[in-house]
């Protein structure tokens, strides 16, 4: 074949692209990488010469993350009152042109192109886009399958399809969109919160098991466990002090004080149970590292909840004061704290991206029941990876491959990356479907979506958002307590002592020694 000498190995992403396209290298080297946009070749083939280690699945994951970030940024711009005023010159409610609206719907009441309605429509398009791909990629186990091209290729067509879905959503009138899609978004948002809680507890549990395995063998790993534990407890303690300083006041904020005190008690409870003798009897690897990670996450959820509640107004010395939020303890009107809103939004979106990538990886490693299996995994040797090591996937690939006879002169099996996916494509898109719904309801204040604005979402807050985040914090505590206490309810395992006694009873007696020693 032409170009066979310079052709790449089958294990690279460029080799996969040539396999999909029939082995021709001319197709991959076409100008402007048009095959990456419209054809079956993955985008990794365009930049393989500069980044040889970039695989098709990794490149696709980065592209999907960029698509989700772009869609979320568009939602924030359409929800921002400041952007609407400066770009369109109107205070609110930018509607579709009446002529186009009458031609499409035959109605004078046109859909709104800004505000919560626009956020619902954009997120409806992105959620539908990922849900369709999740359904089409179910039970996909090989990147060489034709269905894998749907995930790794045809980017221009997929972008046009996504824009078409969003355009169709903007053509749906409000009375048909909001009632059904609002409840779908609430259910999807709660499901994504539960998924985040499972992932953070599994992350802490696996990290602790990983490094505790090394601590039992080497003192350097014990030092790493100690430093990481002190670091997370320090962050949790500093966070608690800052929350008491900025979110409480001697004259009010009783709810904030009670909530902070309760959550600090939760942190102390899970720390005590993590090293309790009854817990360590069933879970010898249990320690303070996982409790410190959960305590730090509890403090983050507490900060997120307190920053989402409306301010409290009290009368002190005949003057009206606004309390319980940073920078609102004085009588004078103040500008909103944009830095606090940006910090809260950045942490929230970082958790969203972590959940989307980690869930798809664990689903490929452990299978459909990864939520249960990830807690029972035992590390054979420690590694710097905080979650499950890469050897899990390699072992899985070795078990899945067919055994070859020793005398058969055939080339060795291809690398694991060619045989198996690095993450589950279907789970990846399904988690992004839930993430789109979660971003939608978070930006629009969950239950009170009417009149939602970006400036109010992360600054003024609402009671609905406050109680949702408080409930998610309590659910995290209950999930971790269940993880610690569940092994206590399991029946005790049989010990091998009866087998040893049975061997002693059936000992053979030689003729020279009629009475064996007892």
Curated annotation (Swiss-Prot):
Q: How does it sit in the membrane?
A: Multi-pass membrane protein
Q: What domain of life?
A: Eukaryota
| Subcellular compartments | Membrane
Which chain regions cross the lipid bilayer? Answer: 59-79, 122-142, 153-173, 184-204, 222-242, 259-279, 286-306, 338-357, 427-447, 470-490
Q: Does the keyword Ion transport apply?
A: no
CC per GO annotation: membrane
Keyword annotations from UniProtKB, A to Z:
Lipid biosynthesis, Lipid metabolism, Membrane, Phospholipid biosynthesis, Phospholipid metabolism, Transmembrane, Transmembrane helix
Entry annotated with the keyword Lipid biosynthesis = yes
Function of the protein? Incorporates a polar amino acid serine into membranes and facilitates the synthesis of two serine-derived lipids, phosphatidylserine and sphingolipids.
- What protein is this chain from? Serine incorporator 4
Q: Which organism is it from?
A: Homo sapiens (Human)
